[in-house]
Amino acid sequence: MALECDSTIVFPRPLTRLVKCDLELRNTAPYPIGFKVKTTAPKQYCVRPNGGRIEANSAVSVEVILQPLDHEPAPGTKCRDKFLVQSTELKPELQGMDIADIWTQVSKANISERKIRCVYSEGPSTANAHANAHHQPAQTTTTSIPTSATDNYTTVNGNVNQSYSKGIDGTALPSTHANPVAAPSTATTQHTQLPKTSAVSHQKPHEAPSTAVKAPTATVAENEPYPKPQSVPTTTSPNNENNALRSTANVINNTRQSTATSPSMFAGNSGNQIGLARVSSSFGRPTSGAKVVPQIHNTVTVQTAFLLAIICFLIGLLF
């Protein structure tokens, strides 16, 4: 196949720190190829770049980073981690596509694979022994040949975990490989619960509805006449009508006599009204002790008006 690489990766001790190794990928074909790197332990390793393009008859150096282990493995411990490098030819129809998107457009028969084993160094002699095997060509397989049933490869992350950013100086840092699913810390729990508490504390209390009652105000339209008092219909008997007529005639006679005897009663003396009792009321109702003058027939009213006109004329002649 076009892609060639080493069959093993040796990680020098101590392994409780961040360990970096270089892996060289070579393209021996006269055409460009695309590659991507997978591993059986994606949470333990970081590969930069984890995929890309290799031009014809050229090579690319890939950096493999081992996250710090929580404890140093015993001598002779066998590492079960593996890497899988997949490659395919970049045909003209795939030239403009992203490397991460070309794998869905390529058939499995056109994808070649190379497996790489991970080894923990045990000393200078062991490291030299592995260094000799480091340059041996890796086993070449294709997707048509099934791989081991126990191997489950996943694309490697291209970024180092932030919790191990200070492990390059050799300081031992805890590893997440032994326990990938870690329980959230107390600070994280408090942080997640903080918005609920703050939301309750800063929530404004509901304002109580106002119980004030506005006093009703009476508005009177301009030039609006005051309401007239409603007259209550009364039923009168024939005797009452006769008595009313008699009293009306008496009032007229008294008015004539008083006009003839004292004509000066109309000369501004408001206290002597034409023999009629005062009637004062705020709503048209007679006060106590007042005499109610019954209604006079229209003819009598006309006669009275005529007499009053004559009296006024005579008074005018006197003055």
UniProtKB/Swiss-Prot annotation:
Its main location: endoplasmic reticulum. Residues 127-150 have a biased composition (Low complexity). Residues 127-244 are annotated as: Disordered. Residues 1-298 are cytoplasmic. Residues 1-121 form the MSP domain. Keywords: Endoplasmic reticulum, Membrane, Phosphoprotein, Transmembrane, Transmembrane helix. The keyword Transmembrane helix applies. Pfam families: Motile_Sperm. It is a single-pass type IV membrane protein. The modification Phosphoserine is found at S237, S281. The modification Phosphothreonine is found at T236. Disruption phenotype: Leads to the dissociation of the cortical endoplasmic reticulum (ER) from the cell periphery and its accumulation in the cytoplasm, in particular in the vicinity of cell tips; when scs2 is also deleted. Affects contractile ring assembly, contractile ring anchoring and displays severe cytokinetic defects; when scs2 is also deleted. The MSP domain is required for binding to the FFAT motif of target proteins. Interacts with epr1. Belongs to the VAMP-associated protein (VAP) (TC 9.B.17) family. This is Vesicle-associated membrane protein-associated protein scs22. It comes from Schizosaccharomyces pombe (strain 972 / ATCC 24843) (Fission yeast). The lineage of its organism: Eukaryota, Fungi, Dikarya, Ascomycota, Taphrinomycotina.
